Amino acid sequence: MKANKLTAIAMLLAALFFATPKAKAQVNAQVLYDFGSDREFVTLTLEMFKQDKWGNTYFFVDHDFNYDQHVKGSPNLAPGGTYFEIARCLNFWQNSSIKNLSLHVEYNGGITRSYPINNAWLVGVDYFIHSKDFKNTLNLKALYKNIQEKDSDVPMQLTAVWAMNDLFGVKGLKFDGFADFWWETHGVDFREDGTCDTKKTVFITEPQLWYNVGQHFGCYNLSLGGEVELSNNFGSTGGFKCRPCLGVKWDF
């Protein structure tokens, strides 16, 4: 029975995420070095967004090249952690008065050399706001969130996603990012005796700023820039953290 249930869920998700009319996808790869005092490693991100007649699909995969931080004395011979998100906005009423409102389905999960990042399932609504020329966009989401084997006082996540193209009238300057706030009872600041502090909420935002330098020499795929991760009680770190990153982005 359990196997049949998992198969049914997998088939439903496949239908939601992949059985959609063909459309051009926006795909990019980012290589960022994290200067955070507790990080100091490289992350490779593969990101995709695809719009279609039924809504849109978004996913990203992060590979953290920090194996040596998980296994002391080991060379940095492999990613120390991988994290994956995939989300589908369903909208069958794009020609109606509520065209900016979509249903949202999402999965998050990952693994590190030291600990798992538990499966999370999210469902809710997304509201889309944009400028007339679509250069500036904002998505606001209210989502029910279930994290496997985790407790929360309020099983919800609130999300904002934004993009601003040609910022300040500068061609090729892009400011984008996201902000997430959710409830999750979790341990932070673990001590040698195994004890830790307990927190109830998590906040993280990662604003990015990119400049398309490639436009000046005929290579429009190449951008330079970075991001700043601002978080509170994120992962196993308690309190507020600011972690700046610099890197390159290639749009396929």
Where are these regions (language model features)?
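Cleavable N-terminal export/targeting peptides
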Residues: 1-26
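Short loop/turn motifs that connect adjacent beta-strands in outer-membrane beta-barrel proteins
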Residues: 23-26, 54-56, 91-102, 130-138, ...
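Short glycine/proline- and aromatic-enriched beta-strand/turn motifs that initiate or cap beta-hairpins
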Residues: 23-67
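Residues that define the transmembrane beta-barrel architecture of outer-membrane proteins
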Residues: 25, 40-44, 78-84, 117-123, ...
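Transmembrane beta-strands of outer-membrane beta-barrel pores
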Residues: 31-37, 63-67, 105-113, 129, ...
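Residues on the lipid-exposed face of transmembrane beta-strands in outer-membrane beta-barrel proteins
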Residues: 46-50, 86-90, 123-129, 142-144, ...
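Outer-membrane beta-barrel translocator domains and adjoining extracellular loop/strand segments
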Residues: 70-75, 114-118, 151-153, 187-195, ...
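Outer-membrane beta-barrel transmembrane domain signature
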Residues: 145-221, 230-233, 250-252
